[in-house]
Amino acid sequence: MKNAYIIDAIRTPFGRYAGGLAPVRADDLGAVPIKALIQRNPNVDWEQVDDVIYGCANQAGEDNRNVGRMSALLAGLPYQVPATTINRLCGSSLDAIAIAARAIKAGEANLVIAGGVESMSRAPYVMGKSDSAFGRSQKIEDTTMGWRFINSKLKELYGVDTMPQTAENVAEKFNVNRADQDQFALVSQQRTASAQAKGFFSKEIVAVEIPQRKGDAVVIDTDEHPRASTTLEALSKLKPVVKADGTVTAGNASGINDGAAALLIASDDAVQAYNLKPRAKIIASTAVGVEPRIMGFAPAPAIKKLLKQANLTLDQMDVIELNEAFAAQALAVTRDLGLPDDSAKVNPNGGAIALGHPLGASGARLVTTALNQLEQTGGRYALCSMCIGVGLGIALIIERVEAH
């Protein structure tokens, strides 16, 4: 079996909902990191890229009709290069990386761009067609996140709890209290603020330029969602979003955001042919299913399954990038794995509570950030994992090449 190497990884800043990136279409936003890969890797013959695999969770608006293909063309890749868009909801871009790695390991590809994009600010309202002529069954659905066009049979089988409701379910099932969730959220904000102050994220971010009718373009080059001034007192005053005695708040949950990320993944043959310098090797990946009502717990079994599959241990992981959909689920996962709530190896530069969670782009962000952390600290292995709506979990392990 061949090796699959990460050659480069880049992302846009993550914008706040209705923030700086809101004027940018999803396909234009998705093109930004691909274009950056092209500019940063001049040795590559881009016509020889075997595929572009992009994740996107919505696909109901401007991200319709294969946003991966549209982003690739808008970025300037030759039209001969194929592209596809996959949808494993929040785990889409992590899955895209895993699919790219499998294709390369199987000898079916040598060069693949994998990543994802999400513009939650521009998610449209949609309306289905009537079941009958002049019917009145239609209703308008907001596609920003969560369920729409619910299947009554699925609802009867597993329920259709909202994402915050699933987090409450996890908090109750695994005894994660409000104080611990708020403390976890505070640490995420503090770590992100520290990383931003040190310029950690600058190495993984490509600026987005937004042309204006008059004057210079607006340049977005910094993540907009972090709140460096967050305090535990402020977090404790926020009202629960699900029920009066609940524990999940806007402060201990991830954001609704816009962003894109892309990685260049290559085989041994491509590395040699284009004189590329591998940064990391993709070791293994897996996905699992859990009961949809506790979807946030899914990274725990996914990580356990993956470590067994890769014949590695949790102690061998130098960095763990666990997507912080909610503090409740992140704590349930880390505690199940035997990790302390403030583990230094888990999200050392903060996570989605601070940085934000543009669904289809987040997995690629996790890998990009994990890779940079490995390189900065000299670590060997990084594990990236995410919970996914409708009861799924996904995980992937990379190994820094120079540590091998």
Where are these regions (language model features)?
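Condensing-enzyme catalytic core mediating Claisen C-C bond formation in acyl metabolism
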Residues: 1-26, 145, 230-297, 301, ...
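Short, well-ordered amphipathic alpha-helical segments that serve as non-catalytic structural scaffolds
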Residues: 27-42, 67-71, 96-99, 163-170, ...
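Conserved beta-ketoacyl condensing-enzyme motif
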Residues: 22-91, 95-112, 116-135, 205-221, ...
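N-terminal extracellular/periplasmic Venus flytrap/periplasmic-binding protein-like
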Residues: 11, 23, 27-32, 43, ...
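Active-site pocket-lining segment
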Residues: 166-168, 201-206, 212, 283-354
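Conserved catalytic cysteine-centered active-site region
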Residues: 24, 56-112, 141-147, 157-162, ...
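Flexible glycine-/small-residue-enriched beta->alpha junction loops
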Residues: 111-169
